[in-house]
């Protein structure tokens, strides 16, 4: 049965193509190979991508921001992105923000990596990357620079979570308290001096009034004595 089918197939191939069965199947195989090569230029690579590559591992979600409270500038430096297990932090005007979601910008190798782990208020206001500007000291800045810094602060407040503040140095607290104490002492001294002056003035006026009264009484007595003497004469 199979032999009959094969003989019939060979006769049909020879009758319709003029080729031997071996030549016919060779041409058919070459045509299929050419089709596969040509179709590869027009079909999207995703069609030929292995299924194992289609399932890409999802990136791990970022942990929720952790509130740190008040920390020093030295402690803030530990969150500059060098340790991938720690959040990436940055401060503006003493307020610390978690910028881990923008690690591509503020993390190692990013365009703003120098600002991470620091209060970069002055650098942001001046758009400077100089080491001396990587500080939270904004004294001496112009109106335009302060406005630019304000824009940065609004951006951070709307995009990132605030996780703490930078602890003020002891010197700053003393400097701020000493002028107040000096003002208080000055005010107390002024009040005391004013009270003493007022008391002295009142005492002088009282003394003058008493002296004037005594003088008037003496004059009256002298006049009365003179009148008596005149009457006797």
Swiss-Prot record:
Annotated region (Steroid-binding) at 70-167
Stored SMART domains: Cyt-b5 (SM01117)
Tell me the GO molecular function terms: protein domain specific binding; steroid binding
Where does it live in the cell? Cell membrane
Record-annotated membrane-spanning stretches:
23-43
* A Pfam family of this chain: Cyt-b5
- For the modification Phosphothreonine, the affected residues are 225
Enumerate the residue ranges of region (Disordered). 169-233
Q: Which residues form a coiled coil?
A: none
GO CC annotation, single: cytosol
- In this chain the Cytochrome b5 heme-binding domain maps to 70-167
> What is stated about domains?
The cytochrome b5 heme-binding domain lacks the conserved iron-binding His residues at positions 105 and 129.
Which family does the similarity line name?
Belongs to the cytochrome b5 family. MAPR subfamily.
For this entry, the protein name equals Membrane steroid-binding protein 2
Q: What species is this protein from?
A: Arabidopsis thaliana (Mouse-ear cress)
Organism classification:
Eukaryota, Viridiplantae, Streptophyta, Embryophyta, Tracheophyta
């Amino acid at each position: 049965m199979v032999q009959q089918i094969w003989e019939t197939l060979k006769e049909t191939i020879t009758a319709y193509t003029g080729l031997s069965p071996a030549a016919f199947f060779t041409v058919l195989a070459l045509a299929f190979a050419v089709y596969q090569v040509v179709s590869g230029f027009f079909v999207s690579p995703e069609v030929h991508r292995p299924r194992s590559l289609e399932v890409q591992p999802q990136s791990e979600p970022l942990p929720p921001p952790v509130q740190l409270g008040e920390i020093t500038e030295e402690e803030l430096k530990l969150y500059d992105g060098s340790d991938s297990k720690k959040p990436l932090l940055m401060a503006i005007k003493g307020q610390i923000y978690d910028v881990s979601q923008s690690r591509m910008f503020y993390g190692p190798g990013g365009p703003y990596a120098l600002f991470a782990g620091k209060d970069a208020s002055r650098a942001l206001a001046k758009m400077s990357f100089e080491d001396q500007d990587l500080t939270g000291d904004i004294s001496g800045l112009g109106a335009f620079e302060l406005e630019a810094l304000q824009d940065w602060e609004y951006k951070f407040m709307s995009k990132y979570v605030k996780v703490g503040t930078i602890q003020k140095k002891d010197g700053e607290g003393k400097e701020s308290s000493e002028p107040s104490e000096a003002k208080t002492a000055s005010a107390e001294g002024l009040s005391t001096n004013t009270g003493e002056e007022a008391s002295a003035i009142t005492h002088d006026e009282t003394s003058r009034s008493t002296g004037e009264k005594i003088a008037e009484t003496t004059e009256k007595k002298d006049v009365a004595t003179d009148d008596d003497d005149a009457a006797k004469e």
